[in-house]
Amino acid sequence: MFKYRFLSVSLALLLLTGCGSSAATAADSTASVSDTAQNEDSDTAGTGTSALSTGTVQTNLSQIDMSKWQYDSDNDVYYQVGISYCETPADTSYETMGIYVPGKYMTAKDNGDGTWTCSVNTTEKVGNYTASTAPVIVPVNTPGYAAQAAPTGYDSSTSEFTAAGMVVVVAGCRGRDAGAPSGVTDLKAAIRYTRYNEGVIPGNMDSIFSEGMSGGGAQSALLGSTGDSALYDAYLKQIGAVTGVSDAVAGSMCWCPITNLDVADEAYEWNMGQ
């Protein structure tokens, strides 16, 4: 359904900008988009649900070490970075993640070395949420399908979410230089690893949401429309993602998602030609 929606929106934009100035042009465009949708449908038909999303959880990765949290006092946030979310990463400079948790969701003890040992506090609230009900946000900042750098410290871009009581997972991911679908594969692996830590860290693992704009919006849309798709199984196996857990998100926020690249190119060419 998402594919048809994106294709329809893109076609409508073309017609509004004047690409359909003649009936023949509009008919040709409609036929082309329809054919594309049918081809994509047949390509994915029968692929079904990922076999890696059900059954017993299997991984050699450890769960998050609750004795290694760092603390940002200005924003009252506990965080960890450099967390490996796959066993056999293709690019270790990207394939780690950070997690950022509102301070009230933790009961913490200072280790005296810049780290804190934390346990989950289920009674405190931040906004409308507790540690058990807090949504988990996965930002996708990949303009032009670029790579997303793995966080190395406190990430101030997460502050609006954490101030509202949400948990934020910032996952480094490969970009277009690595080829598709590397970026989405990495993000799926990070979501799987996050779910693997259910009950260990704060956050409602049934309420994971991705968000992004432009190329990031496109990859957020893919996360939303390909949850637990078997099409990604081979790629997830290749990097050693956690199995036996879901990579589906509850929703995806997609601002200006650039998805239907062929039609977008046609629109640019038509406008530049004027």
Segments from the language model and where they lie:
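Bacterial signal peptide processing site
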Residues: 20-22
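Conserved alpha/beta-hydrolase
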Residues: 163-177
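A domain-start/cap signature at the N-terminus of enzymes
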Residues: 33, 41-124
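Short amphipathic alpha-helix adjacent to the substrate-entry channel of hydrolases
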Residues: 151-166
